[in-house]
Amino acid sequence: MGVGDPLPLPPEKNRREVNKPPDIASTSSSSASAVNNARLSDAPILLFVYFHKAFRAQLAELQFLAGDTVRSGSDLAVELRSKFEFLKLVYKYHSAAEDEVIFSALDTRVKNIVFNYSLEHDATDDLFTSVFHWLNVLEEEQGNRADVLREVVLCIGTIQSSICQHMLKEERQVFPLMIENFSFEEQASLVWQFICSVPVMVLEEIFPWMTSLLSPKEKSEVETCFKEVVPNELSLQLVINSWLIDDSQSSLTALTKIMKGVQSVEVSENMTNSQTNSSSSGVFQRFWQWSKKMSFSSPNTGHILVHGIHLWHNAIRKDLVDIQKGLCQLTFPSLSLDLNVLVVRLNFLADVLIFYSNAFKTFFYPVFEDMVDQQHSSSSKQFTIDGHVENFKKSLDLETRAGSDNFVITLQEKLESLILTVAKQFSIEETEVFPIISKNCNIEMQRQLLYRSIHFLPLGLLKCVIMWFSAQLPEDECQSIIHYLSSEDSFPNKPFAHLLLQWFRFGYSGKTPVESFWNELSFMFKPRCSFEEELTEEASGSFFQQSPQKLFKVSDPYSMDPPAGYMNETPYSSAMNQQILIPGKLRPLLHLPDLFGDKTIGEHLTMDLKPIDLIFYFHKAMKKDLDYLVRGSARLATDYSFLGEFQQRFHLIKFLYQIHSDAEDEIAFPALEAKGKLQNISQSYSIDHELEVEHLNKVSFLLNELAELNMLVLDHKNVKYEKLCMSLQDICKSIHKLLSEHLHREETELWCLFRDCFTIEEQEKIIACMLGRISGEILQDMIPWLMESLIPDEQHAVMSLWRQATRKTMFGEWLTEWYNSHAVEEETEEANKDPSENSDPLDVVWSYLFEGAADEYKGSICSKPLEETELKGIMNKPLGKAAPNNKVEFGNKEENHLEISGSKKVCTGADETKYKEQTDSNAQAFQMSHNTSQSGQDSRYECLLSMSQEDVEATIRRISRDSSLDPQKKSYIIQNLLMSRWIATQRIYNLEPSILSSNREAVPGQNPSYRDPHKLIFGCKHYKRSCKLLAPCCNKLYTCIRCHDEEVDHLLDRKQITKMMCMKCMIIQPVGASCSNISCSSSMGKYYCKICKLFDDDREIYHCPYCNLCRLGKGLSIDYFHCMKCNACMSRLIVEHVCREKCLEDNCPICHEYIFTSNSPVKALPCGHVMHSTCFQEYTCSHYTCPICSKSLGDMQVYFRMLDALLAEQKMPDEYLNQTQVILCNDCGRKGNAPYHWLYHKCSSCASYNTRLF
């Protein structure tokens, strides 16, 4: 199969189309439009968005290239790997710049935004790892080429979806905030800091790469932006412009291997005379060929490399020793400022050593290996300082942020170890490596090595190094270097050489004192603190007894006002390069507690269960279904018959995920952000939800396309089918990656916040609000789906949390009723299920015992046929509840209170006469049809039911001795034999309506009733329906339960109702959504509830699983929600209300009707009590206080002012004029004094007259 490109699909017409992110961009908020409408000339920070455009274009190009089926696998793999290595490197620097420069700055102005985006950056490495694996397989030509290419295309699609969605989110949230909160100058400063923090070698490649993928207009805008961003220094402007217009790829090979930590050359064994071997591919030969092309005119001054390296090593050693001495002199708290400077110097030298070590491994050491055999290079190869320096840098960072009481002592010990390590490494290099390189390389080649090494440093750090190094050198050495840099042929890039000369001269001039130099560098190398607030307590006690956190007077390292100085014209982010070069993160943007240690999430939750954990159990189930999507989409490529099952499962996943996302966006996240310090923390996740729904919609579209294709084309190998399957698998893998990472980030960032910031009661309220929006029909799908993904302990934990959150409702009752009926159905299905073949269990038993048995054995079993009266008695004796139909299709699922009142039957005598004949004929037809179809069955049922216990035992022994049966067949027949009598009884019991219907007078009320006799509409005044219910207490048919309750002196228990009568065919039958008479099959009503035994063909009704009643309305989450505390279904318009526990489970204070099951509208009072709306209207004609708690029913200020005016006109008798009375206010609950009055007493606290004498 040719791989090719996935089939185009809407709404995103082509995934490879340049600069077109998913269609979700059309739903961008006003913040996103701020980015789209802003110009780069007005907002320099948008340079990062132009990088986004380049990334999108490059990914589209790579996906197109991967679809090339003509080229050989190895050639294609090499080209793709080279481009992906470069893309990975550029994206790493882009992400590091956002983390350490953009995000850190934004976090000083807008809190709780950036951590989620940094987590997304961390997840990118896995994406590239996968594609590199398949490229290796493709290059080695292992396996089927088409299958490997398919995997490569799928990996690229996943990378494209993940990175493009991440960039789109940044454009919708991060960069609009940057434009809003930062001035033009501040944005330009951040962009320039990013440029100065990237190695020169990388900058030389990034800028041409980016501009080559932009349109001419965009390229011009970028060039104009750089003129504004780069400081107004001619040398810098010339250098940046030279990089922008340079489109050479000379250093691409070395560049892409900088970060890989591998040697970029192939070792050649015989390199003694390698200068003349132009066919060799070693680094030495490439540098040699390069040096021959150069025409350096400077004189050959000898071993320039060895001499320069000695100067470099001595400067580093000298500074390390000076710092060590400075640490030893710290004995008093007054010298704590000196400690700040020493830590900055250590950070600077650590960065210098890290870059130097990487440059040595990348350039110098491979050349050295090309010149000697492995035996001579073993000592230098086994010992390198990079690991020691990285560990020291990590330790320094951690100790500075957290530290211990012995911070300085610990630092001294680690520094001493570092000095010994560095000295040993430098000694090996000076005695083994550099002398050989200097001896075998001419001056031009040595300069090329130095040139490449200098380019390894970031621009900002390079300036710091030159300034620092020039201050360490004697005057004659400085003059020699100045002379070298001043020569015309010192470097290929003349502007860059001139810039280095300018920096060196400034450092050599001494215009910046050493103290000022380190103070200026403190802005770049100041250690980052993990705490947000500056500690202002004064140090007390001895120096070594202080907390290390109090030793550093740390200013904001991301202030937009860096200290003025020559050094800060080229700012440098040390943390940005640490993120690239040092494995592991040094900076936690947010400190998360170690919730689990080495335990899994499930193990932890069962130990420390909290209500909010219910959300994350849902996450676990969702993750398993994401795996199912990937497996299922792959299976569809070879099995189109699987489409129906996959489509059904996907729609369930999509539906449940949408419910979960909406609940988080509308309930959980707002509750979290309501905590003052957590504002904005969830906005990124809400954007994720919106974008992920778009991806799910694409899957729905593809599945519909596949379904239509299957109906028209039976050949599943059709090319269009293959392309659709390819597109489906591509999107499913992308969804798996996006949603898995999304759920992981929620658990990483938000879970501990929910658990720690909310009390148990608050968590229960959040969960209760989320559950109160889920209808019973959804719960019947959700609960089994959730349970099948969890282990037994987790299942128990989930149901425990669920029951706890709904303990004040009828949920337990609903769950029991639903689960019992569900279990009965499953048992019945299991009893009728043949594990080996699709045959009836009674047929299996019958064929073995009777058809294959001898005549005398048949007679022995069937010698006791049941008499008709005995059979009727058995059939009329229920052995258990008939299994309800659990797969009834519900109508509308949502509404408010309902248990509707009833009416008497409306049926004329003529109607009875007319329908008596119809009833008899229908009953006769029904009975005849059953007699015909069941005559053979009845004889079998009689024989099976006539078997005694002794007969059953004898039969079991006979089966066990039958040598013609295998053990599995024996077990199966014995099992069916033991169940046969129960199954036969159940089936006979379900035939009971035909017997009952044969004698119509035996059941009173077996005639139709009408809601509208003139239009012949079935029902009663309460309901429009096509059936009657058989009341077991009266053995009489009533149209509805309320009709029964109004006619007799007792109440009908709905749970006891098992039979109904169809008013069209007049057949009594088990309760169901439609008539079981095949000749009728009429619907009993648009809405049917098997729990309430409620039918209605007129209104929108839903069954609330928490009230366990049917209510009028469209349903939970549509126009109603269930408040778990009030235990009431309420309109979504009154989400904010006064909760009163089980407020509806009481009588109306006016008419004393039980409100919970009343069908009359209910009025909620401000105090939380309720009464009927009609009762409220009548009551408020003469009262203004609650009849239960006496609080005012509304705002009574107008009435109270009228009383003020009335009392002001009244004159009290003299004997009462100065008397007061003690009162208690019903509104505010306070006690106070009021002037004497026979009726009205005003509260002195709230000015209410709703008071009483105390």
UniProtKB/Swiss-Prot annotation:
Topology within the bilayer: Single-pass membrane protein
Start and end residues, zinc fingers (CTCHY-type): 1084-1147
Principal place of residence: membrane
Annotated residues for binding of Zn(2+) 3: C1062, C1065, C1075, C1080
Sequence positions that bind Zn(2+) 2: C1033, C1034, H1044, H1050
UniProt cross-references to Gene3D superfamilies, sorted A to Z: 2.20.28.10, nmb1532 protein domain like (1.20.120.520), Zinc/RING finger domain, C3HC4 (zinc finger) (3.30.40.10)
Transmembrane segments: 454-474
Protein name as annotated: Zinc finger protein BRUTUS-like At1g18910
Organism: Arabidopsis thaliana (Mouse-ear cress)
